[in-house]
């Protein structure tokens, strides 16, 4: 079973905004998430560094659990998969992990759900 380092709940439009914004860089995406702040960023030669930052437990992110801070990099394709997956429902539970795949879960009703797992890049791959 996966043990998330940080578990949050967000609406699909929030997830789409994050991923759509950083995917403009057309590069890998870094996630730095703490108990108080959510930051995702990507760099490109054309745009420089594209950053999205917002507080945890603010108006748009509901923190469910925090075990330890998360500092991971997801590939461009993994992040693009998150964007596509964000169209599958209205509310998402996202579990970020430093050592295991991160997961996006959407409830479909009647106890059924759909999950997407995305593995972080190895530190050597950067």
PLM regions and their residue ranges:
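DNA polymerase processivity clamps
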Residues: 4-56, 60, 64-126
């Amino acid at each position: 079973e996966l043990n998330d380092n940080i578990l949050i709940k967000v609406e699909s439009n929030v997830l789409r905004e994050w991923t759509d914004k950083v995917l403009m860089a057309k590069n890998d995406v870094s996630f730095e998430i703490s108990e108080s702040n959510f930051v995702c960023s990507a760099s490109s030669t054309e745009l420089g560094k594209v950053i999205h930052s917002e507080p945890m437990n603010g108006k748009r992110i509901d923190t469910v659990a925090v075990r330890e801070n998360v500092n991971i990099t997801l590939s461009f394709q993994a992040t693009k998969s998150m964007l596509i997956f964000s169209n599958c429902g209205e509310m998402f539970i996202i579990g970020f992990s430093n050592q295991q795949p991160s997961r996006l879960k959407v409830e479909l009703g009647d106890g059924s759900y759909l999950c997407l797992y995305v593995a972080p890049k190895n530190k050597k791959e950067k």
